[in-house]
From Swiss-Prot:
Its main location: cytoplasm. One of its GO terms (molecular function) is 5'-deoxynucleotidase activity. The keyword DNA repair does not apply. Catalyzes the strictly specific dephosphorylation of 2'-deoxyribonucleoside 5'-monophosphates. Homodimer. Pfam families: YfbR-like (PF12917). GO terms for cellular component: cytoplasm. It comes from Photorhabdus temperata. PROSITE patterns: HD. Residues 28-140 form the HD domain. The lineage of its organism: Bacteria, Pseudomonadati, Pseudomonadota, Gammaproteobacteria, Enterobacterales. The gene is yfbR. Keywords: Cytoplasm, Hydrolase, Metal-binding, Nucleotide-binding. This is 5'-deoxynucleotidase yfbR. It catalyses: a 2'-deoxyribonucleoside 5'-phosphate + H2O = a 2'-deoxyribonucleoside + phosphate.
């Protein structure tokens, strides 16, 4: 018997942004799906507009599982995780152990199929970069949504994420920011005005 998917189903019980007041609580499961949507879009944009040659479906899959180890480690708040290089290094080691534990939960005959997804040492630098861009973008979008709902608690997080996005800058991210991000600050009525008949 394998408890792999029973564990993954518990990602919905792990709340993100645990130290901050949230107008709407976000869990790791829904965050992972949004990161998969955005990473897939970034990969397609890269391929179509900027002469990229990445596997958009694989990148979406990597993004879907990018926080899977948190079902074992929990979600450590970013300011703590990156407080200093020593903590960041040690937490990375903990994530590797959690990835290995997750993989070992699978039946032996399935482990080699999941290893390239769960073991981030088997991801290319380009794949990692796109998933990290999508992850940061989704955190930024969460800040915009919270700020639009009147929650000033996310002001500093938004400023920090703007720096992160600038550091991870890419043409596909610029395109996504220009074309898709403005809608996240609008109301349902405002975004519904553009729906074709």
């Amino acid at each position: 018997m394998s408890h792999f998917f029973a564990h993954l189903s518990r990602l919905k019980l792990i709340n993100r942004w645990p130290l901050m007041r949230n107008v709407r609580t976000e869990n790791v499961s829904e965050h992972s799906l949004q990161v998969a949507f955005v990473a897939h879009a970034l990969a397609i944009i890269k391929n179509r507009k900027f002469s990229g040659n990445v596997n958009a479906e694989r990148i979406a899959l990597l993004a879907m599982y990018h926080d899977a180890s948190e079902v074992i480690t929990g979600d450590l708040p970013t300011p703590i995780k990156y407080h200093n290089p020593h903590i960041a290094r040690e937490y990375k080691k903990i994530e590797k152990i959690a990835q290995k534990k997750l993989l070992e939960m699978l039946p032996a005959e399935l482990q080699e199929d999941f290893r390239p997804i769960l073991d981030d040492s088997q991801h290319t630098e380009e794949e990692i970069s796109i998933v990290k861009q999508a992850d940061a973008l989704c955190a930024y979008l969460k800040c915009l949504e919270e700020l639009s709902a009147g929650n000033s608690e996310f002001n500093l997080a938004k400023a920090r994420l703007e720096k992160t996005l600038a550091a991870r800058h890419s043409q596909e991210m610029d395109y996504f920011m220009t074309v898709f991000v403005p809608g996240f600050s609008l109301s349902l009525d405002e975004i519904s005005l553009d729906i074709p008949d």
